[in-house]
Amino acid sequence: MKKLSLFACLALLGAALLTAAHHESSPKAVASVHDLMEDVVKPNMDVLAAMKKRGGPQSEQDWKKSKSAASLIGEGAQLMLHPERVKDEAWTGGAEKSIEGAAAVMAAAEKQDTEAWMAGLTMTGQGCRTCHK
């Protein structure tokens, strides 16, 4: 009986370890880098660039829209760091800078701080220009 209990415990432990190992692996990339850039990052950068031309967000709705756009840019940049997408250190550095800039834009939008918003947007653009010269 003790051997059976020990065997059952070991079997459960093995199953738990296999399940944990499966969950720790990275999910597969679904969209291509081009799709992410064209469908997620670029349209949202266009929204922020248009606001920048007007001197920054001008209304409560603009501030909300800029926060939303920055969040999608930041998340898109996070997706660029997926192991199947990383090309080199410059790629990683550019994505990380874009994430940091997008987070700064979001924080500035929360405070409705135009100067900080512009600085965050500049940082986001610098991250993008790491690859897009």
Question: Which positions does each model-derived feature cover?
Answer:
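Bacterial N-terminal signal peptides
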Residues: 7-16
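N-terminal secretory signal peptides that target proteins for export/translocation
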Residues: 1-2
